Amino acid sequence: MIALIQRVTQAKVDVDGKTIGAIDKGLLVLLGVEREDDSFKMEKLANKVMSYRVFSDENGKMNLNVSQAGGALLVVSQFTLAADTGRGLRPSFSGAGTPDQAKVLYEEFVAFCRAKGMPTQTGEFAADMQVSLVNDGPVTFNLQV
């Protein structure tokens, strides 16, 4: 399971010209599900995303997690993160989870974060989305479990 996280000052996701999820300060989480992923990996990754210290403390050191910084999550499904780009000029998605598997784990990820008290907005699974963001830093990390 893969989460590409970006520290943002604002982010939003639109579907059919309508904003369906938006945050100010926080993390944009692009979430990719791989074929071998399960609920155990989902929980491990969700905890890592919520605990990862990428926000600056009073000394300017990356020492605060999203909750400590008063931020929120915007979680967007992105199966292309599971692409194999090692050969040729076209990505292979053979390692990506099936749509049914990915939807279940995506929804579990969101529900888990919300159950932990994390303010969480979402995109729409499998929709054609337009994601806008202001990357703060820029700060971007690729987390995998």
Swiss-Prot record:
Signal sequence residues:
none
Question: Keywords, A to Z?
Answer: Cytoplasm, Hydrolase, RNA-binding, tRNA-binding
Q: Does the keyword Cell division apply?
A: no
Q: Does the keyword Electron transport apply?
A: no
User: Among the record's GO biological process terms, what is one?
Assistant: D-amino acid catabolic process
InterPro entries named in the record: Daa-tRNA_deacyls_DTD, DTD-like_sf
**Motif extent (Gly-cisPro motif, important for rejection of L-amino acids):** 137-138
This entry carries the following GO cellular component terms, namely: cytoplasm
What EC number(s) does the entry state?
3.1.1.96
Q: What class of enzyme is it?
A: hydrolase
Write one Pfam family the protein is assigned to.
Answer: Tyr_Deacylase
* Localization per record: Cytoplasm
Molecular function per GO: D-tyrosyl-tRNA(Tyr) deacylase activity; Gly-tRNA(Ala) deacylase activity; Ser(Gly)-tRNA(Ala) hydrolase activity; tRNA binding
Q: Which reaction does it catalyse?
A: glycyl-tRNA(Ala) + H2O = tRNA(Ala) + glycine + H(+); a D-aminoacyl-tRNA + H2O = a tRNA + a D-alpha-amino acid + H(+)
Q: How does it assemble?
A: Homodimer.
Record's domain comment? A Gly-cisPro motif from one monomer fits into the active site of the other monomer to allow specific chiral rejection of L-amino acids.
User: Which purpose does this protein serve, as stated in its record?
Assistant: An aminoacyl-tRNA editing enzyme that deacylates mischarged D-aminoacyl-tRNAs. Also deacylates mischarged glycyl-tRNA(Ala), protecting cells against glycine mischarging by AlaRS. Acts via tRNA-based rather than protein-based catalysis; rejects L-amino acids rather than detecting D-amino acids in the active site. By recycling D-aminoacyl-tRNA to D-amino acids and free tRNA molecules, this enzyme counteracts the toxicity associated with the formation of D-aminoacyl-tRNA entities in vivo and helps enforce protein L-homochirality.
| Family, per entry | Belongs to the DTD family.
Q: Which NCBIfam families match?
A: D-aminoacyl-tRNA deacylase
The protein's name is D-aminoacyl-tRNA deacylase
Q: Which organism is it from?
A: Shewanella sediminis (strain HAW-EB3)
Name the gene. Answer: dtd
